[in-house]
């Protein structure tokens, strides 16, 4: 049973991972870096239309941020869909009358960020109300193990829901001669920024294949910047951990002859055996135009908040996430939205549930 008092433990031993010690120190977050995205949409428009005509209405208004990732990756649009689904600004029409079916008085917004590590740190520091993170990054942060060994455990981190699988993409030009992770030796490879879950997993994958960061020339590029650098010959390959299909790779595949490099064999088996949050999976052929499918490994994308967040608020947010109207928005809002289901809401959860989320899942019969 997953609960704040009885958190499940993954097959993780403290101190097993060494090459990523440079990522053990929490990322210092520059507030000016954050970009509140355009997904405030109809919710904010409705409030502006009201003109905040009365003090009573103004007092009912509450904002709630969701840290996502780079704008070219899956976290960002999914965050926008969820923000819309859980929002219901003061003065909105009732749900049954065709209005929003979110939380009364709430305006949620998706926030672009560096990714998983950045979001976890922002939640713990109070900079963001919630955020998405890879299951491995969150577990290590919560326990102070793995890549977070030496950091103070983020014991206030709490889970709202498991969302979808994220697949590790290793991308190279089709004629690059890079056919395996081992072929990255001596190459220029983008590992994403140190504040991202991709960076963490890239180091783990290289370690499993006998490579250290000193065996290649690392770069720290995200999304479209990595794609452009690959097209222009400035890098030889790049990693990205994201739900497929992701926008930056859809665009890249339509403009250039690329390949996905498999992450498989003994190295993949070692990863899935050593770390319980990794699973063997595949990126199917046809996901990206003209690109063959490959075997790879995957991790879970999950939604987190702080234990300090109001129980009633998180209960209502969780309830709104899983109502019928939210289901419709998820199904049409993004290809990965269909994978976000109540049946898998607790899949792979290694950080305790927030008390408000736990209450909803018990009422819904998901937790017994």
Regions found by a protein language model. Give the residues of each.
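Extracytoplasmic small-molecule ligand-binding "clamshell" domains
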Residues: 77, 81, 90-123, 290-291
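Bilobed "Venus flytrap"/periplasmic-binding protein-like clamshell domains
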Residues: 63-98, 162, 166-232, 327, ...
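Pocket-lining segment of extracytoplasmic ligand-binding domains
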Residues: 135-137, 145-146, 176, 212-304, ...
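Sec/Tat signal peptide C-region and signal peptidase I cleavage site
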Residues: 54-58
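Bacterial N-terminal signal peptides that target proteins for export
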Residues: 33-44
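An extracytoplasmic/periplasmic, membrane-proximal ligand-sensing/linker region
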Residues: 10, 19, 221, 225, ...
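A structural signal for short loop-to-beta-strand junctions that line the ligand-binding cleft
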Residues: 149-163, 286-295
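Bacterial N-terminal signal peptides
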Residues: 45-51
């Amino acid at each position: 049973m997953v609960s704040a008092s009885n958190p499940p433990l993954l097959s993780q031993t403290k101190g097993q991972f060494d090459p990523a010690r440079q990522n053990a120190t929490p990322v210092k977050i520059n507030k000016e870096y954050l970009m509140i995205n355009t997904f405030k949409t109809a919710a904010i428009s409705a409030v502006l239309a009201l003109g905040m005509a009365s003090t009573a209405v103004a007092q009912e208004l509450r904002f709630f941020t969701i840290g996502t990732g780079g704008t070219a990756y899956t976290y960002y649009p999914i965050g926008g869909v969820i923000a819309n689904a859980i929002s219901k600004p003061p003065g909105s029409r009732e749900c049954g009358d065709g209005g929003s079916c979110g939380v009364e008085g709430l305006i949620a917004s998706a926030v672009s960020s560096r990714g998983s590590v950045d979001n976890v740190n922002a939640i713990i520091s109070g900079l963001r109300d919630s955020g998405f993170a890879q299951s491995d990054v969150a577990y290590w942060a919560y326990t102070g193990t793995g890549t977070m060994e030496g950091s103070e455990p983020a014991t206030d981190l709490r889970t709202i829901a498991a969302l979808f699988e994220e697949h590790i993409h290793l991308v190279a030009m089709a004629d690059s001669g890079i056919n395996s992770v081992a072929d990255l030796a001596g190459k220029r490879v983008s590992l994403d920024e140190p504040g991202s879950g991709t960076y963490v997993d890239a180091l783990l994958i290289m370690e499993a294949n006998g490579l250290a960061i000193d065996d290649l020339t690392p770069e720290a590029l995200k999304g479209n910047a990595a794609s452009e650098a690959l097209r222009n010959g400035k890098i030889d390959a790049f990693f990205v951990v994201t739900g497929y299909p992701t926008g930056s790779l859809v665009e890249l595949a339509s403009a250039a002859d690329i390949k996905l490099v498999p992450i498989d064999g003994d190295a993949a088996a070692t990863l899935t055996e050593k770390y319980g949050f990794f699973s063997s999976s595949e990126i199917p052929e046809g996901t990206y135009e003209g690109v063959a499918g490959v075997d790879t490994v995957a991790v879970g994308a999950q939604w987190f908040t702080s234990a300090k967040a109001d129980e009633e608020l998180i209960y209502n947010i969780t309830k709104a996430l899983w109502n019928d109207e939210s289901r419709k928005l998820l199904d049409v809002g993004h290809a990965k939205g269909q994978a976000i289901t109540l049946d898998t809401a607790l899949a792979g959860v290694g950080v305790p549930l927030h008390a408000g989320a736990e209450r909803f899942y018990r009422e819904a019969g998901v937790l017994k």
